[in-house]
Amino acid sequence: MKIAILSTKQELSSTQRLKEAALARGHKVKIINTLRCYMSLSQEKPTIHYMGKELARYDAVIPRIGASITFYGTAVVRQFEMMGTFCLNSSMSITRSRDKFRSLQFLSRKGIDLPITGFAHSPDDIEDLIQMVGGTPLIIKLIEGTQGIGVVLAETKKAAESVIQAFLGLKVNILIQEFIGETQGRDIRCFVIGNKVVATMQREARPGDFRSNVHRGGTTKLIKITPQEREISINAAKALGLNVAGVDLLRSKRGPLVLEVNSSPGLEGIENITKKDIAGMIIEFIEKNAKPIKAYSRYQG
């Protein structure tokens, strides 16, 4: 098969692992800079050009779309879909996952348990919003933040009001979330491929922080998840339409809660801790599912 990996930074570990895994299984693979793709639409056919030439057809595309280029990146993925190319995660599923509140709305509609979450526009509603999520302490998040950036723990009502007012004053979209204190800065990353959780790890925040992201200095260790945690992870990925996802869970007193669903989960940390060839599993999934399809048939707006 001919496989394209969409990535703006080909040196990234996850991108290289996917390339290695594809080559090891006998496929032709090319890393394509998403931002150097440019597109043409006409009555006859959609095309993608790359560095001065029309891009060759590929059997499958692996989108590694960074949060900062979601709009353009998903447009490129959508163009591949219109050309009939199998995309590991669809443009629609990536878009759903990137807007934190929108993704939680999808999960809530499917009956998936979440931390109580609020969203408001007017500063006049701050006091009621704080009460809606159970009061302080509470978490304040940028709707399009990643890797723990733009996540604030407000421990008092006064602090919460000040931070929320500051964000709203800057016309920044934020969501407010209940603080699950019993997790003690720990969460669980479940790596989902298709309808299966293929790897799990626990992440723990560094001392003095509450964010467990490895990019923020958090540590990881192996963990065994429960059947309920496995089921909720698979259902969360399915609710957003993702074939591959990193589902972050919290173990709360009322059971597992889905914190977030990542459409471009990193491979390095979880492969290192579990010693599993997750990149190889992704390529195997593509082999089983990348069948020739009619052009335009995957485009859903």
UniProtKB/Swiss-Prot annotation:
Residues 104-287 form the ATP-grasp domain. It comes from the Bacteria. Mn(2+) 1 binds at D248, E260. InterPro entries: ATP-grasp, ATP-grasp_RimK-type, ATP_grasp_subdomain_1, RimK, Rimk_N, Rp_bS6_RimK/Lys_biosynth_LsyX. It is an enzyme of class 6 (ligase). One of its GO terms (biological process) is protein modification process. ATP binds at K141, E178, F179, D187, R211, S212, N213. Its cofactor is Mg(2+); Mn(2+). Mn(2+) 2 binds at E260, N262. Mg(2+) 1 binds at D248, E260. Disulfide bonds: none annotated. Binds 2 magnesium or manganese ions per subunit. GO terms for molecular function: ATP binding; metal ion binding; ribosomal S6-glutamic acid ligase activity. Its EC number is 6.3.2.-. Signal peptide: none annotated. The keyword Repeat does not apply. Keywords: ATP-binding, Ligase, Magnesium, Manganese, Metal-binding, Nucleotide-binding, Protein biosynthesis. Belongs to the RimK family. This is Probable alpha-L-glutamate ligase. It comes from Coxiella burnetii (strain RSA 493 / Nine Mile phase I).
